[in-house]
Amino acid sequence: MRPNLFSGASRLLTYSRNGKLLTRGRSTKATSSSLDSQHQDAATTEGGRAESVEESPEQQRKLPTREPLAKNFFIGVVDKELLAYPEVIPRDEMAQLENSLLPLKNYFVEPRETEETSPETLRQLGLYGLNVSTDYEGKGYGWSASLMASEPDSTDINVTLGLQTHRVVVDLLKEVGTPLQQQRYLQDLATGKLIGTEAIYEISPPEEDYFNTTAELFPEYGKWQLNGEKSFVICTPGERQLFLVLAQTQQPNVPGVLGRGTTIFLVDSQQEGVRLGEKHATFGCRKAEIRRVHFEGVKLGEDQVVGLPHDGNRYSEQLVRSSRLRGSLVGLSLAKKLLNELAQYTVNTTQCGVQLQDLELTRIHMSRAMCSVYAMESMLYLTAGLLDEFRAQDVTLESAITKYFTLRQVYAIASQNLGVVGPKSLLSGETTELGLRDAAQLCTQGESLDTLGMFIALTGLQHAGQAMNTGVRKSRNPLFNPGHIFGKFLDNNSIDNPKTKMQLSEHVHPSLEAAAQCIELSVARLQMAVELMFTKHGNAVVERQSEMQRLAEVGTLIYAMWASVARASRSYCIGLPLADHELLTATAICSEGRDRVRTLCTEIYGGHFVNNDNNLVRLSKQVAKSKGYFAVHPLTFNF
């Protein structure tokens, strides 16, 4: 909720990411340049720094870690083997899962006597324990299975908001919680006796600090005291809840900014000093219980700290990854609902003797919505499959990209539906009106899209900077590196016609050869744009926010293209129903994505004097100086 665009994005990059990295036997570079050896050196260095972490039996059964897929797009490297869409749920387990979901689908699809779904009903349906281990009376589902099992309840956005934040708390406890914390909380979380929820955001955060909510440690008692309030907390009044609270803390004997940190606490709603505040009258999701929560002198033990004290940013990666993936599922379900409602409306509506479905504009709108939903779903389950298939796989960027793409597209679909339906959509209670409100709520609650875009670009640039360091230094010092500059002059690679050597078409169905070529060209253009930005701006690249937003969109489009092609190729090869139309969908996504990537990268190459950024920045100074619109009336005389 902080207005500063860097508030969430840059903060998450301040902690070190330690994890085992297995350098692949052979990755494929998009363009031929001098970055190959640099990339290998960076990978070796990062692998050398990896710490040995004790792994669970579940992790040990997975395949070795691969290099990050989306991060490598920024340096022109692709992992062609990941074009094989993951199949992490065996056939027999998939059949059992589909059968177990039938009661859930029937409950949420069929009309109910009462619109309200009580927590007791959700307990009986077993929806609280989907991602809890079977050791604690849960279902024991992995990422892909738990997301698939969450689809029925995600059709009711007011119900699923509480369930998804509950599952985020479970995910964090499974990954970074101590054995004592897992034994204490997971069984109650699985059965619904205890309902987890995040308490992170504040309406008015401080200008300099992380949070107004603070926690102070009293070493002589071994206790923490928590004070403050959180907003936009999804509550279940009358039920026992477990709040996941991020609070600002100060390291002992380290004064000032150096000792400032964040700590993650687990706070039981029945503890003294915890009080539910008023319900927020939000723009969308109006039936959900979204409230303020007040913490007034709450005493917490050291066993209620998740991870290490003062080091909450270190565990933010696991927290936001889970939150983004499960939030993307909510957006995906809403987008599907909007598309289905629009299709029904166009089929059943006739105007001036013509069915709406026969109008070309309506067809184009429905097809674009279909492509967006297909890409959302492909990205979500590709990311989940990577987590399920590979050990400690880095999907930080993939999860952020999935949420970024999903929320942008679901809002676009919701707003465009208004134009198709017409003035009727303005009536209160219409499905189009409710859909627009819910889409706007998802886009605004939590991370803003601008902050998420900055995070995507910063993460990609951070990864690319390690690999491109040597080459960029030479390019920025041409007098001391004439051979390097001469090689650049002889290179006939261009942003309009980049050369690629990836041969992705060999790893997908032959019908997708053109789509694979679109991905190759887009990855090559992204790598060239990143290298140019480093060469032009150096360390000041983080200040070029408009260019970074373009980079974020390019990386997002490439991942959407990649996931769609991988999914469509699998569908056609195994003969799924309507797989030929999936090929058409993936081809349309890649064709449009290629053109958009070329436009964005050309704008980056042109610079701020060519792409109009300079004019807009200059204009903004006068807008700020005048505190708004500054032009006089167009009919004014000057005499």
Swiss-Prot record:
The knockout note for this entry states: Late larval lethal at third instar; larvae die before pupation. Larvae have delayed development and an almost 4-fold prolonged lifespan, develop subcuticular melanotic masses, have small eye and wing imaginal discs, and have malformed fat bodies.
Known EC number:
1.3.8.-
What keywords would UniProt list here? FAD, Flavoprotein, Mitochondrion, Oxidoreductase, Transit peptide
Mind listing the GO molecular function terms for this protein? flavin adenine dinucleotide binding; medium-chain fatty acyl-CoA dehydrogenase activity
Q: Which GO terms describe its cellular component?
A: cytoplasm; mitochondrial matrix; mitochondrion
Spell out the Polar residues composition-biased ranges: 28-43
Q: Where is this region: Disordered?
A: 23-65
InterPro entries under this entry? Answer: ACAD9/ACADV-like_C, Acyl-CoA_Oxase/DH_mid-dom, Acyl-CoA_Oxase/DH_mid-dom_sf, AcylCo_DH-like_C, AcylCo_DH/oxidase_C, AcylCoA_DH/ox_N, AcylCoA_DH/ox_N_sf, AcylCoA_DH/oxidase_NM_dom_sf
The annotated transit peptide is positioned at 1-26
Q: For bias kind Basic and acidic residues, which ranges apply?
A: 48-65
Its subcellular locations are: Mitochondrion
Biological process according to GO: compound eye morphogenesis; fatty acid beta-oxidation; lipid homeostasis; medium-chain fatty acid catabolic process; mitochondrial respiratory chain complex I assembly; negative regulation of cellular response to oxidative stress; response to endoplasmic reticulum stress; sexual reproduction
Q: Can the keyword Phosphoprotein be found in this entry's annotation? A: no
Top-level division of the source organism's lineage:
Eukaryota
* TM stretches of this protein: none
Q: Which cofactor does it need?
A: FAD
Question: What does this protein's UniProt record list under function?
Answer: As part of the MCIA complex, primarily participates in the assembly of the mitochondrial complex I and therefore plays a role in oxidative phosphorylation.
**Family stated for the protein in its record:** Belongs to the acyl-CoA dehydrogenase family.
The subunit field of the Swiss-Prot or TrEMBL record says:
Associates with mitochondrial complex I assembly intermediates during its biogenesis.
What is this protein's name?
Answer: Complex I assembly factor Egm, mitochondrial
Q: Which organism is it from?
A: Drosophila melanogaster (Fruit fly)
For this protein's source organism, the top of the classification is: Eukaryota, Metazoa, Ecdysozoa, Arthropoda, Hexapoda
